């Protein structure tokens, strides 16, 4: 069974382990989530729970949103996501999910929206190598051959310049260094996708190494 929680990335800091090792960590504020809906194999074809995070003003919501959250006896939520293969039987609609679902040392996957970089060339966007910068070369930071003679067309998937970032990214197998139940904080080893204050999903690792 998978477990998860929604939160907001606060930023990065460092903590000392018991052996004196300095560990870089990302601080995630995961205030209590509310179970808005339960999905089962019988009714929806798969098992999942729908979580809501952070209240939203009713003025900014429509009638379907208000009705959906009213069934869980809660206010409209800003961030709503599903946690697949969750323990559907162990949770009820309207129940709160807190940071104590995770423990120190557990391995998790964190999903967020990567930082937007704007329009970038192929070297920054795809990691291509640049051409010679001297000796008469006129090829420096270009995308490379477009096949103008043969095959006389541009192949699908050709790596070109374009808008970079703003994609959904999941970083797998991150260790939880500390769980602060008083302040609803998770300290995760390493970095996670997104800018400060961006919304993230923390789930139990899918491909944890044994």
From Swiss-Prot:
Family: Belongs to the universal ribosomal protein uL3 family.
GO biological process terms held by the UniProt record: translation
Protein name per the record: Large ribosomal subunit protein uL3
GO molecular function terms listed in the Swiss-Prot or TrEMBL record: rRNA binding; structural constituent of ribosome
Alphabetical list of InterPro entries matching this protein: Ribosomal_uL3, Ribosomal_uL3_bac/org-type, Ribosomal_uL3_CS, Transl_B-barrel_sf
Gene Ontology annotations for the cellular component aspect, listed alphabetically: cytosolic large ribosomal subunit
Source species of the chain: Bacillus anthracis
Record keywords: Ribonucleoprotein, Ribosomal protein, RNA-binding, rRNA-binding
HAMAP family: Ribosomal_uL3_B (MF_01325_B)
SUPFAM superfamilies associated with the record: Translation proteins
Keyword Cell membrane among UniProt keywords: no
Residue ranges the record marks as coiled coil: none
Region named Disordered: 125-151
Function as written in the Swiss-Prot or TrEMBL entry: One of the primary rRNA binding proteins, it binds directly near the 3'-end of the 23S rRNA, where it nucleates assembly of the 50S subunit.
């Amino acid at each position: 069974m998978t477990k998860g929680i929604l939160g907001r990335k606060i930023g990065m800091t460092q903590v000392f382990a018991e052996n004196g090792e300095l560990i870089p960590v990302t601080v995630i504020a995961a205030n209590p989530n509310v179970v808005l809906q339960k999905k089962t194999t019988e009714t929806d074809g798969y098992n999942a729970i729908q979580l809501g995070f952070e209240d939203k003003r009713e003025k900014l919501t429509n009638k379907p949103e208000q009705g959906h959250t009213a069934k869980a006896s809660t206010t409209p939520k800003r961030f709503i996501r599903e946690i697949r293969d969750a323990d559907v039987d162990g949770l009820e609609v309207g129940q709160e999910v807190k940071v104590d679902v995770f423990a120190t040392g557990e391995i998790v996957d964190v999903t967020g929206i990567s930082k937007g970089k704007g329009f970038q060339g192929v070297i920054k966007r795809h990691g291509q190598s640049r051409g010679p910068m001297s000796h008469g070369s006129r090829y420096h930071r270009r995308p490379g051959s477009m096949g103008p003679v043969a095959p006389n067309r541009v192949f699908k998937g050709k790596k070109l310049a374009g808008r970079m970032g703003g994609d959904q990214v999941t970083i797998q197998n991150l260790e939880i260094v500390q769980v602060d139940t008083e302040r609803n904080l998770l300290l995760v080893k390493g970095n996670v996708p997104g800018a400060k204050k961006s919304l993230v999903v923390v789930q139990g690792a899918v491909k944890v190494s044994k």
